[in-house]
Regions:
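Short glycine-rich, low-complexity/disordered patches
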Residues: 25, 42-55, 114-151
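Short, exposed beta-strand-loop hairpins at the edges of beta-sheets
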Residues: 149-168
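Short helix/turn-capping signatures at newly exposed starts of structured segments
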Residues: 18-63, 75-85, 96-103
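Long, charged/polar, surface-exposed segments that mediate recognition or autoinhibition
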Residues: 73, 77-138
Length: 178
């Protein structure tokens, strides 16, 4: 009979550890902002509080992201925890803007997940290649909504998404809180 309470203690310990490890996969918002500014210094990334009009009460802070390139985005934080990052690029885009979008996406991966430059660049390029291929296939099929979408799931409950359409591109990192 003594084993039953011990089993509950062990299960409770592992249950308490799992959410902590998922949440620790991403850094806090302040750390993300500083690291992204450093990683994408040449893009002159700037953050400003977004104006949100809503009747619903929210514990989220939303920031608009601007760069000196034609790339913008949003950052959503909850209780100083990273919740969501999105980068946007309008199409048709110049080669310079496309490069800036890819660089900002890779820099966000480094800032959010602590990946090295090679891993983050490879992940961003692999997702971009898939999205381009899926967009071409969507056009060939004559889909009603023409888009190339791809997503990846990384440890800690974090999801990565990339979507290409004829009018824009969007890259997202979504934390386990979202």
């Amino acid at each position: 009979m003594r084993l039953l309470p011990l089993a509950f203690v062990v299960m409770a310990m592992f249950g308490a550890v799992a959410p902590a490890s998922a949440a620790s996969a991403l850094m806090g918002c302040d750390a993300f902002v500083e690291k992204l500014r450093a990683e994408a210094r040449d893009l002159q990334v700037d953050f400003s509080h977004a104006l949100i009009v809503s009747r619903a009460r929210s514990d989220s802070e939303v920031f608009d992201i601007t760069t000196k390139a034609e790339v913008d985005g949003t950052l959503t934080c909850r209780h100083d925890g990273f919740a969501r990052f999105e980068a946007h690029l309008a199409e048709p885009a110049t080669a310079r803007a496309t490069t800036a979008f890819e660089r900002l996406s890779a820099a966000a991966l480094r800032a959010a997940l602590g990946w090295d430059a090679g891993k983050s660049r490879a992940q961003a390029q692999a997702m971009a290649s898939d999205a381009k291929e899926f967009l071409a296939a969507s056009r060939e099929r004559g889909d009603v909504y023409v888009a190339g979408k791809t997503e990846e799931h990384v440890p800690g409950g974090v999801s990565l998404g990339l979507i290409y359409t004829d009018v824009d591109r969007a890259f997202a990192i979504v934390g386990p809180q979202e």
